[in-house]
């Protein structure tokens, strides 16, 4: 947290909005993981203002998804449903790499709402999109979320297959924290 927090002023001075977004999102996520949901909520406003000032509207979708992730941690079903209905990207249309974070949050929402098959289908679509371009961290996360959906759907064979793929990627690239955070 200290490293991320210390980097933010440097990134602001360089006006690198994309890297600043990542640093602020990491700080936000650390607050969530540490159970500081109330402290994290006003942080979204600060991130949104910085994005708008920097003219990087393409980051809005990821920021909206980050807000939804806070709602997932806080159990705010009303906010989750609103995000799914009005802000989440539509996976039935063409998938966009820039919305990857939002798609991954959408899978988590599907899992929470008991829509296991929708979670599996979206995970598979994402895997087909990111596997050819070697986005291994996203791939690992997709396999893990797919394994979770298979578990919920009581499909033990596919659960083991998906989990093994996630574990293999985690081992190869050191993504242990990614799996542990879920």
Predicted regions and their residues:
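Alpha-solenoid helical repeat architecture
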Residues: 1, 11-26, 38-39, 51-67, ...
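Tetratricopeptide repeat
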Residues: 3-7, 40-47, 80-87, 119, ...
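Extracellular beta-rich repeat passengers
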Residues: 84, 105-107, 111-116, 120-123, ...
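Strand-loop-strand
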Residues: 146, 150-166, 171-182
